[in-house]
Amino acid sequence: MTTKAEIEIEQTATGSTLTSRQRTISLVAIYAAVFTWGISYAGLMPLMALTLEGNGYSTLSIGIIGAVTPIGVILVAPFVPFIVSRLGTLNTIFLSSVGSLVMVALLPIFNTYNEWLALRFVAGVFGGMSWIISESWLNSIASEKMRNRITAMYGAVMATSFAVGPFMLTMIGVGDFWPYMVFAILIAFSLIPFALIGKMAPVLNLANDMKISGILIAMPSLLAAALVCGMVDMSMFSFLPIWGLRMGYEQEISIQLLSVFVLGNVVLQLPIAWLAEKTNGRLVLVLCGIVGIFGPIGVTLMADNLYAMGAVLFVWGGCIWALYTVSLAMLGERFKGGSLTAACAAFVVAYEISNIVGPPAAGYAIELWEPHGLMALMSASALLFTVLISARGIYRT
């Protein structure tokens, strides 16, 4: 849910003359920082949703809370170049990370609904800064021959942290104070790796003059893939635990369902990428769309069999995330240079917009048809995508 593709990086002596050992140390440090931050983010979402649910808030209200963070990310993105030029790479990382952990630590203190809206919005602003700079840093030190593997590992680390977050919540429990402190401390831990590699921080030139006009007409199917992935991703983070509760599962099991869903994101990306390389990326998108249609149906029908339902969640989660990763690879095949930057910018904007729209839509769907509205909406969104890409033809984008 980030704007890494919007970033053009000017390699400097700091980024381009690193030794192999320095490059490896920097990459490991970035992965470690992203991992701890991701755990906090992924654990906080179901924690807040379950807390609001327990306090009697509607699913629509919970969905709105989930939507304000991406709004903060989108709004801060144009200002990141100015902030980095004034403060520098490392200082901006520290400012944004400290701001994020403070916002999380304040959640149990200022705990009215409107206060949470404000805190989550500001957290999105700070978190967006950290995310953009982290991925810029990663790109600036990645060699061309290793870039795909480096960014693939980054995605796997992120997905793994998203799986660990909800599981950690089941270990510490849903409470009024300590869970928030644990997740705030994890954000603080993410600063340690950056501090260790501070002297190797690159000077980043982040372009903010992107042109994305005409991209929608050129690649509607790929943008639709980003929209569906973002909608399902954020909606499941916000509501899958609540869906589990309303289907009769205990709270711990309901939270772990989310970990199973995200675990599919981690494990299945390389096999699906291999399939796309050996066959056709567009065909794989169609197949993933079909899984997206029938996955929610299967989860609902198998709700009485925890293991069977978990297997469907696992495969469904992997295929939904593959809509993003396979489409992103297809962008690289079709667009180059400045055109690629514009295409990826549109792609990321589509993903973030769906992050904003998805949770409120999912919450409203649950209110209309409790508890099956969530799965019905997820299936319907995948159906629309599959019809679109099929209508345009497997060999077109």
What is each residue range found by the language model?
Residues 129-142, 321-335:
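Intracellular juxtamembrane helix-capping segments at the cytosolic ends
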Residues 76-88, 173, 268-280, 366-367:
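Helix-to-loop junctions at the C-terminal end of transmembrane segments
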Residues 121-156:
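Cytoplasmic helix-loop-helix junction between adjacent transmembrane helices
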Residues 338-367:
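A late C-terminal transmembrane helix in Major Facilitator Superfamily
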Residues 170, 184-204, 388-392:
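C-terminal membrane-cytosol helix-exit motif in multi-pass small-molecule transporters
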Residues 21-70, 233-243, 247, 254:
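Helix-loop boundary and gating motifs at the non-cytosolic
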Residues 282-325:
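C-terminal transmembrane helical hairpin of 12-TM major facilitator-type secondary transporters
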Residues 91-105, 184, 283-297, 379:
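Structural signature of the two symmetry-related core transmembrane helices
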